[in-house]
Structure formats: structure tokens, C-alpha cells
């Protein structure tokens, strides 16, 4: 990232750290304490933030953006969170990580935690939260219904110069 002629002016690397590989315990998945330790080789600052705290995530994202803009160097955000369900429909993470997933099952969702906070401070009412969730669910349902008859357009990125590879002459 600091090689002359190849600088990008910095980049923001956002790690959604669910603390687990497909079936690998974190202590067996790397030789360093954090999954973001590789960023130390380019001296990028690393911010670790709790994924259950949307305001903290937003705050850290703003700091990272300001750092990148001011110093034009890479920065890393390590959002520590968890995957409530498996990697896909066939994965049952409780088989390989039973203790972790027992704790996750007992832990409230990020939406529940943040909604409770907003209601407690008077920013929203529970009726507001319920209405927002109902609207979002209705949106998801309508998008799912729309996708059932969806036919993608022909890949237009293969038109033009790339439609006949090898026929254009390279100019040097």
C-alpha cells in the first residue's frame, strides 16, 4: 500500500469478524491473536468494535474515514460479532461449536438490543419499532415475490470492446 507508483491514497478494510471459521475454532485458525494482525505489516491502525453496538460501529467508521482522508493510508475496522445461523442452509454450527452457539442462542439480537435502547431513551416507541420491522419484512417479502419471475439481462459487459477478444490492437 505504500509502494511508490502503486499507492491508492489509503483504503478502509472492514472485517466482519464472526469469530469462527466454517468449523475451525479461532485459536486453531491463525498464529496471531487477532484476524486483523496482518495489517500491522503496513502499520495500519486497527479499530476493534462491538458489532452489537451500531452507534459504536458508526463512530469507528467515521474515525477510520477521517484517518484515511487525512493520512491517505490504509485503516482496518474489526467488527467483532457472531453468526446467529450457519454459513448456509445446511450448516448447523451447534455441532462444531456447541458452547458458543448455546451462548449465541441465549443472546438477544442486535436489533433487539438497539431497539430496547432507543425505546428506553425515548427516541422511538415500541409501536415505532414494530412498524419499522413490519415495513422491512413487507419489503423483503415483496422483493422475494418479485425475484421468482426475474430473468437477468444478457451480460452487457461482454459487448463493445470485449465482444471479440484479441481483435483490438494494444497501443503503447
Residues covered by each model-derived region:
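Structural signal for hydrophobic packing residues in well-ordered secondary-structure cores
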Residues: 4, 19, 61-72, 118-119, ...
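Beta-strand segments within the central parallel beta-sheet cores of soluble alpha/beta enzyme folds
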Residues: 9-14, 76-79, 130-131
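Short, conserved secondary-structure transition motifs
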Residues: 16-23, 83-88, 136-141
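Hard-cation-handling environments
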Residues: 111, 121, 125-172
Amino acid at each position: 500500500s505504500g509502494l511508490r507508483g502503486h499507492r491508492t491514497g489509503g483504503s478502509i478494510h472492514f472485517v466482519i469478524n464472526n469469530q469462527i471459521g466454517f468449523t475451525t475454532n479461532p485459536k486453531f485458525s491463525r498464529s496471531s491473536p487477532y484476524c486483523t494482525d496482518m495489517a500491522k505489516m503496513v502499520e495500519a491502525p486497527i479499530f476493534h468494535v462491538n458489532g452489537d453496538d451500531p452507534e459504536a460501529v458508526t463512530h469507528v467508521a467515521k474515525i477510520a474515514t477521517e484517518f484515511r482522508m487525512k493520512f491517505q493510508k490504509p485503516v482496518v475496522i474489526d467488527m467483532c460479532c457472531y453468526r446467529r445461523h450457519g454459513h448456509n442452509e445446511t450448516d448447523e454450527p451447534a455441532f462444531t461449536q456447541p458452547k458458543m452457539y448455546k451462548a449465541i442462542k441465549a443472546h438477544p439480537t442486535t436489533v433487539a438490543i438497539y431497539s430496547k435502547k432507543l425505546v428506553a431513551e425515548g427516541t422511538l416507541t415500541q409501536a415505532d419499532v414494530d412498524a419499522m420491522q413490519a415495513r422491512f419484512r413487507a419489503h423483503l417479502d415483496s422483493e422475494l415475490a418479485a425475484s421468482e419471475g426475474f430473468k437477468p439481462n444478457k451480460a452487457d459487459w461482454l459487448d463493445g470492446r470485449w465482444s471479440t477478444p484479441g481483435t483490438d490492437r494494444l497501443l503503447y
